[in-house]
């Protein structure tokens, strides 16, 4: 982590980011929102809240965060398996949360699959509280192909 730098994500990072996402277990994606075009739209709307951890030209981790002006959301967070347990994930979360604070966002939410034990443990250590008083619901407005890793 000596030469690791965290910087805002750019659409030119997409190929490396997508490859990292596909290498991580227990994550959910889809063919529209997580396509290069979908991520490009997302980054245009949220240019300052997603980050990559790089060392030289190697992608070590990524956090995809955005907000609607009221609430922040962390959509994906991944660290390459060989770089885990080095504080990279925590550093990415810290940077993302600071960017939300800078944009006057007061609350941040995220979703983690129930069976993703490592992910749930990580987010609990980051201070994210499990809400058991709400049901999460969604509706697809177009046909999406799920890509679960």
Annotated model-derived regions:
Residues 66-75, 84, 130-132:
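A conserved beta-turn-beta hairpin within the catalytic core of GNAT-like acetyltransferases
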